[in-house]
């Protein structure tokens, strides 16, 4: 096991055990049985570990899905499955509300993915920036709700909800726009 893997494993185990991401560097170093210097050779802080865990588990899944040229439904399901497989960590990590939290990381990283996907379709850079942020934020808000609810629903169910929200919007818009606003 590499030093970097020891650090991540120690962090994940501590987060799950203590039910918080507010784990000190000292605790991580002690649990990983490494020096502080070794820790700082790889990571600046716990947020950078969280980001690396996200990249390793979720972004690697995204890249695999692209390589396999999966359908949209299969693709989205695999992403939800990757979160589900690591739910003990992600359920705790999503609750962190500090700057550079998992929530911020997912939005930022998803925005990069969406920008990449749509850059050839949407030529206006400002519009691309806003739309990629919109898609990333929408996806992350749905994910956050699922995580905060304890991931009771299946990855397949979440895929259905995610895809339905995009497919049905235009159809629903016509019937919704004519409703009275009496809430």
PLM feature spans:
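Amphipathic alpha-helical packing segments from all-alpha helical-bundle domains
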Residues: 98-141, 148, 167, 171
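Helical hydrophobic small-molecule/effector-binding pocket
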Residues: 70-115
């Amino acid at each position: 096991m590499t030093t970097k893997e020891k650090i991540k494993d120690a962090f994940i185990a501590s987060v799950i055990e203590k039910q918080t991401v507010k784990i000190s560097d000292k605790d991580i170093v002690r649990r990983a049985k490494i020096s502080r210097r070794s820790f700082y050779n790889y990571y600046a802080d716990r947020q950078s570990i969280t980001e690396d865990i996200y990249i390793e588990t979720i972004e690697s899944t995204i890249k695999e899905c692209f390589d396999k040229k999966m359908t949209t439904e299969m693709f989205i399901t695999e992403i939800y499955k990757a979160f589900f497989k690591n739910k003990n960590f992600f359920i705790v990590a999503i609750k962190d509300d500090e700057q550079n939290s998992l929530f911020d990381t997912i939005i930022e990283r998803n925005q990069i993915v969406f920008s990449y996907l749509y850059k050839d379709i949407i030529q206006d850079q400002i519009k691309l920036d806003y739309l990629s942020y919109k898609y990333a934020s929408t996806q992350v808000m749905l994910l956050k709700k699922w995580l905060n609810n304890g991931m009771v629903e299946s990855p397949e169910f979440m895929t259905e909800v995610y895809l339905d929200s995009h497919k049905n919007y235009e159809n629903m818009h016509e019937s919704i726009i004519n409703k009275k606003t009496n809430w």
